[in-house]
Amino acid sequence: MSAVGSYRSPLQVIRAYCELTKPKILLMLAFTSFSAALVATHGSVDFAKLLFMFIGTALSSGGAAAINMWYDRDIDAVMERTQGRPIPRGMIDPEKAFRFGLLLGVLSFVVLYVLVNPLTAWLGLAGYIYYAVIYTVWLKRRTPQNIVIGGGAGAMPVLIGWAAVTGTLSLAPILMFLIIFFWTPPHSWALALYKNAEYTKALVPMMPVVKGPRSTKRQSVVYTVLLFATSIALYFTHAVGALYLVIAVPMNVVFLYATIKMHQEADDTFVWAKRTFFWSLVYILVVFTAMMIGM
């Protein structure tokens, strides 16, 4: 029996609404925005403004995620990886999830516009629309380039973090944006390779489903090379110091090695696809930490 309409404790309801915001992704986005803000000010950041930026970014990200779960509820019910989300398991009515997502989006714009600055608010709104509409509604079910083009949504928080403390944008935050943009395909496709059967069942045109493992792996290597070049280019903006380079270079080598090994393994074997996915998470954590300690 569906849980919608049955008794749910207040704690269960709160937990379900929190799950709608995809908190793990939200934390990663908050981390990258914090890194950008710290690099922009070389550590001399206004922590009150930083706090409001965090709140606004979290509201924007969480609201877009809720809209995503509302729209994708049919897919989520099919895929084993997502069947435990609040809407498929009946914890939240779809219409309420949609209204919740819209509310968070509006609150995000107000918080960022009033308490941070207008540029940050417009960037937050752009990120919200990018993920909730452009990626979720337009791209995800229509093209294998869904996460390539949609990767910009996950990269927006670095622009938000930088703009929050400077009121402007420059080459450095754009390169930080591109780091996440180029990181997204090998990260997402590594997961899609070993979850290929689920995406096929749900009729989601991920790259492995449409173009096959061989093409997906080859493109993953290309994007990792672009990622390598972009992350090194950041050093030459003088936004980060030599310590960043000392950490970023070997981290890029490791990640590139993983994607090459993934490309070399048999298409029905996923050992290196899983390792590449793991190293992609390590990569983003280490490289953005290196930006902060090496500025």
Give, region by region, the residue ranges found by the protein language model:
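Transmembrane alpha-helical segments that form the membrane-embedded catalytic/substrate-channel core
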Residues: L59-I67, Y130-T136, L178-N196, F228, ...
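Intramembrane alpha-helical segments
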Residues: P94-V165
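Membrane-embedded alpha-helical segments that form the functional core of polytopic membrane enzymes
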Residues: F31-R73, R81, W122-V133, P173-W183
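Interfacial loop-to-transmembrane junctions
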Residues: L256-V286
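Hydrophobic alpha-helical transmembrane segments in multi-pass integral membrane proteins
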Residues: L159-L169, L227-L234, V282-M295
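Multi-pass membrane catalytic core of lipid/isoprenoid biosynthesis enzymes
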Residues: R81-W122, G212-F236
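Cytosolic, membrane-interface loops and tails of multi-pass inner-membrane proteins
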Residues: S2-I14, Y71-I92, W189-K217
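Small-residue-rich segments of transmembrane alpha-helices in multi-pass membrane proteins
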Residues: A30-F34, R85-P86, V148-V165, R214-S215, ...
